[in-house]
Amino acid sequence: ACSSNKDLMFGAGIAEYAIPISFKSHEKKIKNDSFNSIVYLNASKSLTQYSYGILMEKADRLMYVDYYTARDYYSESLDLFLKSRSYMVQALSLRHSDFESKMMKKESINFKIDDVPYLYWLSGSMAGSIQASQGDPEHLIDLTNIRWLLENAIVLDPNWEKGSLYAAMMSVYLNDLSGDQDSERKAL
């Protein structure tokens, strides 16, 4: 059992150094193919997964032991979440004209089932920004956008990635600031 833990720790160490190298590859692909929404999606996924899986994990573990180092990890992850958010807004804008404005106004968009990963990863980057900023109001205002994105995705494909959309939506309901007293019950 101990050896598998060491192997996992070793693998995590490799990922910590290898994944940021892939960011340069993603940026190059975006530069060379800036009208292809898939390159933005792939870059966003990498940024978000690295931020949650490596940086936020380290920050959370260090928060009460080495506050200033933890803050540095949160700050770095926030920067990556914001870049990921920007990539996903760009990707969805390529797929749906005036996407960002429509999202802010919660207007109807004719999303397709192929949009589900885009909606999910945009909501994930927004949620990550809230978490990494420790609830900074500048990012907290995205809670309604996260809910809107996930609700639209669930309508399209409720079983996507074995219920990942519902798992994400539970967090939204549990952090609902709208005053809806049934919000927690809806989540459960």
Regions found by a protein language model. Name each.
Residues 153-157:
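Ligand-binding pocket scaffold of soluble enzyme catalytic domains
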